[in-house]
Amino acid sequence: MALTAALKAQIAAWYKALQEQIPDFIPRAPQRQMIADVAKTLAGEEGRHLAIEAPTGVGKTLSYLIPGIAIAREEQKTLVVSTANVALQDQIYSKDLPLLKKIIPDLKFTAAFGRGRYVCPRNLTALASTEPTQQDLLAFLDDELTPNNQEEQKRCAKLKGDLDTYKWDGLRDHTDIAIDDDLWRRLSTDKASCLNRNCYYYRECPFFVARREIQEAEVVVANHALVMAAMESEAVLPDPKNLLLVLDEGHHLPDVARDALEMSAEITAPWYRLQLDLFTKLVATCMEQFRPKTIPPLAIPERLNAHCEELYELIASLNNILNLYMPAGQEAEHRFAMGELPDEVLEICQRLAKLTEMLRGLAELFLNDLSEKTGSHDIVRLHRLILQMNRALGMFEAQSKLWRLASLAQSSGAPVTKWATREEREGQLHLWFHCVGIRVSDQLERLLWRSIPHIIVTSATLRSLNSFSRLQEMSGLKEKAGDRFVALDSPFNHCEQGKIVIPRMRVEPSIDNEEQHIAEMAAFFRKQVESKKHLGMLVLFASGRAMQRFLDYVTDLRLMLLVQGDQPRYRLVELHRKRVANGERSVLVGLQSFAEGLDLKGDLLSQVHIHKIAFPPIDSPVVITEGEWLKSLNRYPFEVQSLPSASFNLIQQVGRLIRSHGCWGEVVIYDKRLLTKNYGKRLLDALPVFPIEQPEVPEGIVKKKEKTKSPRRRRR
């Protein structure tokens, strides 16, 4: 489709009308360029897909929404906007699209959040009820559907009242009533515990109401994980050929795709035996009480028992073999080098893939049959069986995918990382098996790049080390396929608005020197606080261990510090805003993930402190396997993995400072390697052009460590 004069005029008219809706709107050349580039790509005038880096201040959201809506209307397609997290998804849904609706009154839009973000009306009704009979009726579903106390019941009753009177849409983030994680776990549901069309509340269920709204909407706001799942199952979203897709925060896409394809499952032999026994009893109950018209051969008791017995024997053998590979001790891990399994393990995985797939098919067949049963049956008993079969299907589906992935030598031209872990829970040892591909470009090509005609991938940061090469390698986007890569200029004058401060630290921030380095960092930070030059500050760490140690050095400043983990992030930011608005000093402290998407302008944030260059962890099974693979190709892992990742992280962290033309301040980076190592210049060259200062550092007095047992974290 060509960009007609009428279409261009429509885009220009909306852009002009938008300027009148936004106070102090500043026209920006990069924004106009982005609108033009997005329009050309979505209309098919230039290239296949577009990766466009739009630095903070460009106004990228409105720059893709305006041309996206215009072209979607012209082509009678649906514009799907996907983000990496719920916060940005909600911002687009609750702020940006309502703003556009002022200039496009008939605009229809909705949001597609994951099932776990919505309340389950069945669970809410039970938890809000004061009638024991109501709770008893729903308790048959094996869920914890009774309130813990009267206060919790009253809270649920208020939520139910808001839902029933349409004051609340059922989304966790859209109510002012405090809901802790434990209560929300009982209020929401997952795919395995949902009765779907068989539920009494199906028609009014917020999740399914939202899904039905997708069919009528011109714009759907989703997230990357949901889009990947929708493309895989060909459900939820319209047909790919009838889509225009924008992937905001597109730098997350390869990781989200990899997470979606990562498979982990418990394979502890006694636990597995129990699951198989429960499934055979479940099948027997279905055959006895809800006999299907056509009996699957595998459902015959003798055959099913033999099938499950073979499956169990293979799992037991695998347990024995894996325990031999793992080091002694209750908690242990073994990774298979280059993802290559021994022949005996590979043969077991291949057979397990076939056997679990057959059980998955059997569970699906019974579930479909049960779902079609009429009201002539005992509805309580039927629904109980549907839920149990649904959960069995979920288990065998995951197992089937795991063993299929374990049987693969490569995925997307790279090895599949495979490892086993043993851990202790409540005095019992549990064995797990894990698989994840280190490259997902083939899957992205199949699900996205080849399926959807034109896609926009955008973010404030898509490049690392001034190059799109890492994005291209990880995502599979490539110029020879007609994909375009554009980096827009920043609208800000960084040279005049801020500066980078690299204190003259006495040591590098290595593990060996960590204690002295943090002592010096704390001393310099204290000096900055005492200067009273900045009201709003942000301190970012590469690890929780370092952050905790830093806090040990500044205990007298603790009341000023708002630390990640003390409260949910949005509450910390809310409190920070209130403090600064009242003229008080406030310091946000967290890990690098805490800063992503943080938008604090002016005095709210005028000094950012960065503990050190954040290289990725090198002890993750995925990173180790990728390193082995790169070395086998005579490529240098530091150049391919570590440095691009560190560059990307640093750009993101530094980008927290200048968010508008009125922002000012300093970025303090406590890492002398930026000036002493060869790669330091490359990292600095990829940052906005700030003047650099190198002040002296007060001597830090090293404190003695208190001996504490560090919690074991699960690696991947």
From Swiss-Prot:
Its cofactor is [4Fe-4S] cluster; Mg(2+). It catalyses: Couples ATP hydrolysis with the unwinding of duplex DNA at the replication fork by translocating in the 5'-3' direction. This creates two antiparallel DNA single strands (ssDNA). The leading ssDNA polymer is the template for DNA polymerase III holoenzyme which synthesizes a continuous strand; ATP + H2O = ADP + phosphate + H(+). Changing R211A: Significant decrease in helicase activity, small decrease in ssDNA binding. ATP binds at I26, Q31, K60, T61, D599, R656, R659. Changing I618A: Loss of helicase activity, loss of ssDNA binding. [4Fe-4S] cluster binds at C120, C194, C199, C205. Keywords: 4Fe-4S, ATP-binding, DNA-binding, Helicase, Hydrolase, Iron, Iron-sulfur, Isomerase, Metal-binding, Nucleotide-binding. Residues 17-294 form the Helicase ATP-binding domain. Has 4 domains; the discontinous helicase 1 (HD1), helicase 2 (HD2), arch and Fe-S cluster domains. The arch domain sits above the other domains and contacts the Fe-S cluster domain above the ssDNA-binding surface. Addition of an ATP analog to a DinG-ssDNA crystal induces changes in the relative orientation of the domains; HD1 remains tightly bound while HD2 slides along the DNA, upon ATP hydrolysis HD1 slides while HD2 remains tightly bound, thus the enzyme translocates in a 5'-3' direction along the ssDNA. This is ATP-dependent DNA helicase DinG. It comes from Escherichia coli (strain K12).
